């Protein structure tokens, strides 16, 4: 791995616009499960039936009981070396944009100043009626009956978690920013993503189509491996830790 890390470090230092995309694998080293493995969050349930706009509107009690069971452990998670190295690369000016499919807020907790969140964030919630946004602590409650459903303190409307639900469109501003970054990238890092979910999996394709080189940090193969210049099969934290050491960056 060392020789490949050294080569990639030189490319990163020489790049003018490096961009990273992170997926669930970036947070597994924080103790968080991914979504698509045999031990992932959707292993025993059809998520569309419960984490959807339809479920929130028609079965809010079931929605919030499942939501809290599946997601509440994310609120106490801490950043791991993946988040810390990427934040350090941003501070050093080596990484220009950071795009994530994750909703856990760990990039920000590690100090990343600018994160494009494609799937929303657990750090906030929004009223379905008036559209106001609030801290996520308002939905961190036990829901057993309709009287317990989190409601807007301003208008009384039902609160929706800040994550993008099934049946809901991705935020347009995030998609536009991510596409712009991918098209400008001369170096594109994929970190902890299986690249199975669109439209995020098309971002590295855009980068390559516009002349960017691709580095993939993922334990399992992806459909873009044949187009990658560098592939790291180690845990992302291990590979990025080696990269930070090669660059002389302390975390």
From Swiss-Prot:
The keyword Repeat does not apply. Its main location: cytoplasm. Pfam families: SIR2. Nicotinamide binds at residues 35, 103-104. InterPro entries: DHS-like_NAD/FAD-binding_dom, NAD-dep_sirtuin_deacylases, Sirtuin, Sirtuin_cat_small_dom_sf, Sirtuin_class_U, Ssirtuin_cat_dom. One of its GO terms (molecular function) is histone deacetylase activity, NAD-dependent. It catalyses: N(6)-acetyl-L-lysyl-[protein] + NAD(+) + H2O = 2''-O-acetyl-ADP-D-ribose + nicotinamide + L-lysyl-[protein]. The active site is at residue 119. It comes from the Bacteria. Its EC number is 2.3.1.286. It is found in: Cytoplasm. Residues 1-250 form the Deacetylase sirtuin-type domain. Keywords: Cytoplasm, Metal-binding, NAD, Transferase, Zinc. Its cofactor is Zn(2+). PROSITE patterns: SIRTUIN (PS50305). NAD-dependent protein deacetylase which modulates the activities of several enzymes which are inactive in their acetylated form. This is NAD-dependent protein deacetylase. It comes from Symbiobacterium thermophilum (strain DSM 24528 / JCM 14929 / IAM 14863 / T). The lineage of its organism: Bacteria, Bacillati, Bacillota, Clostridia, Eubacteriales. The gene is cobB.
């Amino acid at each position: 791995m060392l020789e490949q890390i050294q080569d990639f470090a030189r490319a990163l230092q020489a790049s003018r616009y490096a961009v990273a995309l992170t997926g669930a694998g970036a947070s597994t080293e924080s103790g968080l499960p991914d979504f698509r493995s045999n031990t992932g969050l959707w292993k025993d349930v059809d998520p569309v039936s419960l984490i959807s706009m339809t479920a929130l509107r028609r079965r809010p009690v079931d929605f919030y009981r499942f939501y809290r069971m599946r997601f509440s452990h994310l609120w106490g998670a801490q950043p791991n070396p993946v988040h810390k190295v990427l934040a350090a690369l941003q501070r050093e000016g080596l990484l220009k944009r950071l795009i994530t499919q994750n909703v856990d807020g760990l990039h920000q907790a590690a100090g990343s100043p600018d994160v494009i969140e494609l799937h929303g964030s657990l750090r906030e919630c929004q009223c379905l009626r008036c559209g106001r946004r609030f801290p996520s602590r308002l939905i961190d409650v036990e829901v057993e009956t309709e009287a317990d459903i989190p409601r807007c303190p301003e208008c009384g409307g039902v609160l929706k978690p800040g994550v993008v639900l099934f049946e809901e469109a991705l935020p347009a501003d995030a998609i536009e920013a991510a596409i712009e970054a991918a098209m400008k990238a001369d170096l594109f890092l994929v970190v902890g993503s299986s690249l199975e979910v669109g439209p995020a999996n098309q971002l590295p394709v855009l980068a390559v189509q516009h002349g960017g080189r691709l580095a993939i940090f993922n334990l399992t193969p992806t459909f873009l491996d044949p187009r990658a210049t560098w592939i790291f099969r180690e845990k992302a934290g291990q590979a990025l830790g080696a990269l930070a050491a090669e660059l002389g960056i302390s975390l």
